[in-house]
């Protein structure tokens, strides 16, 4: 296990900032303003070490009674999103503790996990990058067809994992080893170099890089 730190946040969109050499750096802005520790898991009580984080306000009347009791035990108002992060540094956290953007220092390497944009039902060319058929004489409505998908009498079926048309996107993805350009504690915003998964308004998890850089 590692000493990974984490924050839940909402993707606000992309911008650009100047670096010390006078170059524009593309950054993604992430709102991490309402993070709070809702539970601390220890070896003695739970069999493993982890910290549970809550993010985003929610109407208390829309929270189930078991969850309402969970939040009340932690001494925090109900939160819309919960996530649990494994870490060895559970002694540094306690239930009800608020976490700010400065949990990550400028220059820190992070992994960002989010849900990618959904593209709907897509064909094999868009979804998998298949080559289209030649657009010339003799071609009849074949330009974007996938071609043969199976064998003959043996194995008499299409093998699992065959790349075919289907729903594209809206899956969990992680972009690794991104750099924190700045941490605005007053406004609760992290500026992370580069692009991260998901649309504007999407919920993301920012964690210390597992592979380093």
Curated annotation (Swiss-Prot):
Ribonucleoprotein found in the keyword field: yes
Bilayer-spanning residue ranges: none
GO MF terms, alphabetically ordered: rRNA binding; structural constituent of ribosome
InterPro entries from the UniProt entry: Ribosomal_uL3, Ribosomal_uL3_bac/org-type, Ribosomal_uL3_CS, Transl_B-barrel_sf
Cellular component, GO annotation: cytosolic large ribosomal subunit
Alphabetically ordered keywords of this record: Ribonucleoprotein, Ribosomal protein, RNA-binding, rRNA-binding
One of the protein's GO biological processes: translation
Protein family (similarity comment): Belongs to the universal ribosomal protein uL3 family.
Annotated PANTHER family: 50S RIBOSOMAL PROTEIN L3 (PTHR11229), LARGE RIBOSOMAL SUBUNIT PROTEIN UL3C (PTHR11229:SF16)
HAMAP family associated with the record: Ribosomal_uL3_B (MF_01325_B)
Subunit structure: Part of the 50S ribosomal subunit. Forms a cluster with proteins L14 and L19.
Function of the protein: One of the primary rRNA binding proteins, it binds directly near the 3'-end of the 23S rRNA, where it nucleates assembly of the 50S subunit.
Descriptive protein name: Large ribosomal subunit protein uL3
Organism of origin: Bifidobacterium longum (strain NCC 2705)
